[in-house]
């Protein structure tokens, strides 16, 4: 995959011989290969943590989901992600959104856990949904299924299951995860504003924050560089390289966000009477743009 960054610089650690790459501040200017490396490191780290925790549970405490494989696929997370990115031409925003979707899905579907049995199907589903929701052009599910190594019918089921669980809130926005959690508890697609308490969603509307989606992904980008930018920070050793951001770039601001789950979210648009929530439009756009196989 090509590098899209003119800002990427590299030097060698004299003590360990590990290349040090200074990434661009903007994830859209980062090499897609570097993004895949970072996200793969994050995923492998999460898998290691979750599977270590799962060993303490009995079999009857583990719930199988549609994302489970019978056995772990014989392709690494990194190589699988590279395959999806290369043959489906995944864009930067799609790569980052696949990571964001982990927090989103786990919020409304506690039975889902990212592990060696679920990671591959989740990645395939996440990148398929994100591509359709965020990109102007995309392929059919038949293509994505072939690249991902599953049957098209299975991918259709996974995609539909994901969309229903997150109420079609597939665009990363401030307070999106919070709203999904409230909706899941209330069993409603549109939340009564009185149930939101002190959460002021008007200030988070698309009109007031047109770059909300970018800002959420930017937080995830900076956070994963902080957490797994170092080669020694993750069990994934696919690429021997250390990643850092430019020295004048802040990592993740702790105000208004959380470090483990950057609970961004979405908001109602009080300036438009026909759109109570911008996510209702997201669902309409997704259905309109999705093509049958």
From Swiss-Prot:
Name listed for the protein in its UniProt record: PHO85 cyclin PHO80
Top-rank taxon, per record: Eukaryota
Role of this protein: Cyclin partner of the cyclin-dependent kinase (CDK) PHO85. Negatively regulates the expression of phosphate-starvation-responsive genes under phosphate-rich conditions. The PHO80-PHO85 cyclin-CDK holoenzyme phosphorylates and inactivates the transcription factor PHO4, by preventing its association with the transcription factor PHO2 and the nuclear import receptor PSE1, and by promoting association with the nuclear export receptor MSN5, excluding PHO4 from the nucleus.
Subunit structure: Forms a cyclin-CDK complex with PHO85. PHO80-PHO85 forms a stable complex with its inhibitor PHO81 under both high- and low-phosphate conditions, but PHO81 only inhibits the kinase upon phosphate starvation. Interacts with transcription factor PHO4.
Modified residues (Phosphoserine): 234, 267
Residue numbers spanned by region Disordered: 254-293
Keywords, ordered alphabetically: Cyclin, Cytoplasm, Nucleus, Phosphoprotein
Organism: Saccharomyces cerevisiae (strain ATCC 204508 / S288c)
Regulation acting on activity, per entry: Inhibited by the CDK inhibitor (CKI) PHO81 in response to phosphate starvation.
Segments of skewed composition (Polar residues): 254-272
GO MF annotations, alphabetized: cyclin-dependent protein serine/threonine kinase regulator activity; protein kinase binding
Post-translational modification, as annotated: Phosphorylation of Ser-267 by PHO85 is required to form an active cyclin-kinase complex and for function.
UniProt record similarity statement: Belongs to the cyclin family. PHO80 subfamily.
N-terminal signal peptide: none
Basic and acidic residues bias (residue ranges): 276-293
Main location: cytoplasm
